[in-house]
Structure formats: C-alpha cells, structure tokens
Amino acid sequence: DGSTSTAEAVSMAKRITKRNKVVISPTLHPQYAEVINTLISSNEDEIHYEFSENFEVEKLISKIDDSVSCVVVQNPDFFGSCHSLEQLAEYTHSMGALLIVVVNEIISLGMMKSPGEMGADIVACEGQSLGNPLNFGGPYIGLMSTKDKYVRQLPGRIVGETTDMNGEKGFVLTLATREQHIRREKATSNICTNSGLCSLAFTIHLSLLGEMGFKKLSKLNHEAAIKLYNKLKTLDGFEVKNNSFFNEFTVKLPIDASVFVEKMAEKGILAGVPVSRLSN
C-alpha cells in the first residue's frame, strides 16, 4: 500500500501547489509509477518518468521548472542504493515545488537520515515489514507524513488526542470533514479501503520494539546485507552494482536472473527478484 500512499502524496502536492506537472526519479519502483499514473493522471497532467538504474541529481534538477508540482524520489531506491537529497530538496523548493520521498523499506529509517532532515515535504512509506506477513501480496499498510503546514491537505482523517468530561485521555477522529461522505467531489481522498487491522499490528510491533529495538533491527538488516555483499564479491561472474545500500542491492549475474532465482528456490533460498520482470 506504499504505492497508494505515494499516489495520494502526489495528489496532495498538486492541491497545494495548484500545478499539474510531476517529475519522478528514474529509480522509483516501476509499479509505484504505474499506480501514480493510474490514480492521478488526467488530460491536464504531465508525468515525467523513465525507468533507469541511473540516479543523477543534476538530471533530475534539469527537469524542474516553475510548472512542476512535485518531485518524487525513492530512498533507498528500487535498486537498493541510498542517496543524499539535500541539494535536490533545495532546488525543488526554489522552484516552488514539493519534494516527496518514498521509503519502500521503513526499517531503513533506524539507520538512515530521515527524509524530513533531508528536506522532504511529504513522505510516503510501506510499513509491511513491521508486524504484517506477506499475505500473498496484501493487504499491507501505506504510511504518510508531512510538514505541519500541510496537515490539512492530508487524505482521509486524523486521529487526535483529547480529554473526556472526566479529564481522562482519549482519542477522536478529527478533520474528517475532508472525506467523501461529507465533501463529496471536493474530498481530499476517495479511497475507501480500511487497513485498520494492518495498522494495529504495525503499531503493536513498533511499540514492542521501542526506539532502541527499532535501531537494532535496522542494524541487523544492514549487517546481514554487508555479509552477503562481501561473499558475493568473491565469486567469479558476480558484479554488485551498488556503492551504498541498506539491506538490498543489485547483482549482475553470469546467467539469466530468472534461471538463477528458480535454481535458488529449489534449494530453499529466496534469491530476490529479476529486475527485468518489473521493468518491462
């Protein structure tokens, strides 16, 4: 559901800036780009996306002008690489556009600098890896965060903390006036799925981990990836493409990737996903 969250973030940016041009990093997950195109695009929209393994800040900047509503960047990206986004954020803001950062693996936030620290205006995340099994592809949990000044443009509703008549702490649904049963065509979102159970599982898991547990989990992921990375580098015909990564990286193989993945599965090993399967 991180893809849906990303599409909603783009829609939100368009409302805020009142612009229709969207620039998407070439290293965004191609299926996320498809969801954006399906949910957001209209005759008035101009979406710039061309899937590639090359993330170059200068090339992205060259596509940004004063007609752009937002720039969408995944970090770590589809190929597993991690990026510094401060320069991109600064230029994006200078053009009056918003920076949307997509975090496909939320556990990475236990080690990496947060999107907000790098200048993101809106953050869209996939939270499946905390408390939610794979479920044959879903449902998962889409997460979204934004700067305080944009909070009223968030889709759906917000759960707010308050006190009852006895002074006891309680929670209420606030800003629900943005939803379609009240605002109809002027609603900020028209998605009606409810991932409450997934959200609850995510919240319980995160609460049990706590701050230190979350950081430890992130570190374990990274260290395991480094161990595999170092092993693969010693094998003939294997070329690791990434200079920096969190818990995933891209490997060029001496044989067809689909064949390799199939052979590994026979040995009980999930070897990853052939890039060509998702890029075509």
Task: Give the positions of each predicted feature.
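Conserved PLP-enzyme active-site core in the AAT-like
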Residues: T4-G170, V251, S258-M264
